[in-house]
């Protein structure tokens, strides 16, 4: 049996959290997920986590601390630098895409509105997480 993926999901919309969890299950992805819904709680979690996540999936539009600020802090930490990051957000602005690319994210995905879109999103997340294991 394959080891479950350790995922950190930084997302403030409970409906999107549930959709992502359902899509992971529908695609038979074995995972353990920590969900953080407020940006200001991310570094408390990461600094006290016994096991770092294999992949971070995050929104850019978060309460209390902006997702871009979180992304910059993650990429500034040597212990977190190698963790792949998938940005999953409603934003599709060229500025956001450019910023995230410069921060070294693995994938930028605009939140889908269809089941097929969510299945494609799951495929992307699993591919990024799998490649980090190799």
Feature map (PLM): residue ranges:
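Conserved acidic carboxylate
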Residues: 11
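Two-component/phosphorelay signaling modules centered on CheY-like receiver
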Residues: 14-39
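Acidic, metal-coordinating helix/loop segments flanking the phosphotransfer/catalytic sites
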Residues: 35-55, 119
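Hydrophobic residue at a beta-alpha junction
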Residues: 37, 62-65, 74
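Active-site residues of response regulator receiver
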Residues: 58-59, 89
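The feature encodes the CheY-like receiver
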Residues: 63, 81, 93
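C-terminal output helix
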Residues: 113-124
